[in-house]
Design a protein with these regions (language model features):
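Extreme N-terminal starter segment of soluble prokaryotic enzymes
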Residues: 1-4
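Short glycine-rich anion-binding loops that position phosphate/pyrophosphate groups of nucleotides
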Residues: 10-12, 76-79, 102-104
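Glycine- and acidic-residue-enriched helix-capping/strand-helix junction motifs
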Residues: 15-29
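Short beta->alpha junction loops
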Residues: 45-55
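Short, glycine-/small-residue-rich phosphate/pyrophosphate-handling segment
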Residues: 48, 97, 106-151
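Short acidic/histidine-rich motifs immediately flanking catalytic phosphotransfer sites
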Residues: 64-71
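Short Gly/Thr/Asp-enriched flexible loops that form oxyanion-binding sites at enzyme active sites
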Residues: 82-91
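A short, charged, Gly/Pro-tolerant segment at domain boundaries
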Residues: 149-167
Length: 170
């Protein structure tokens, strides 16, 4: 049975309360239970973790090395500036998919920047809670190539960007 770590970063513990027009009315508990059910139906064991603290998230990512088959990760606001989390993902061989409930590419300018995605094998955005299931599907396909620097210029824009697919012809 594959081991998957579901990580949710800062403020995601406030789902259902914070900006329901953007994130919906369902809670983090709803998200975690729905994802765990989907993962179990696909032969995976899930551990759920949420923290508002960068160092705790770094430690959790480090702990996946050699013990976990994949990470589904919504870094929240850390997406836009946390090089510590990006480096943590880069320091382990565990493939990770970055997920966002809303389509961050259509929101405020600062939300369009991800320093995390280059260390991930894919980015899923704007698919609501279903995006987490999409992320698991990508991990189960065995994608291990990371998006890398400048991925936005090499891949077709969209809600789901997977390393090695949808490359722009040069």
């Amino acid at each position: 049975m594959k081991k998957i770590l579901l990580i949710n970063g800062p403020n995601l513990n406030m789902l259902g309360i914070r900006e329901p027009g953007v994130y919906g009315n369902d809670t983090l508990s709803d998200l975690e239970s729905g994802f765990a059910e989907y993962a179990q139906a696909h032969g995976c064991e899930v551990e759920c973790f949420q923290s508002n603290h960068e160092g705790d998230l770094v430690d959790k990512i480090h702990a996946t090395h050699g013990t976990c088959d994949g990470i589904v990760y919504n870094p929240g606001a850390h997406t836009h500036y946390s090089y510590a989390l990006r480096d943590a993902l880069g320091s382990v061989s565990t493939p990770c998919v970055e997920v966002h409930i809303s389509d961050v590419s259509t929101r405020e300018a600062f939300r369009r920047i991800s320093v995390i995605a280059p260390a991930c094998v894919a980015q899923v955005k704007g698919r609501g809670f279903a995006g987490y299931n999409d992320a698991l599907d990508i991990l189960l396909e065995g994608v291990t190539e990371r998006l890398g620097e400048g991925f936005e210029e090499r891949y077709m824009p969209g809600q789901v960007i997977v390393a090695g697919r949808d490359l722009i012809d040069e």
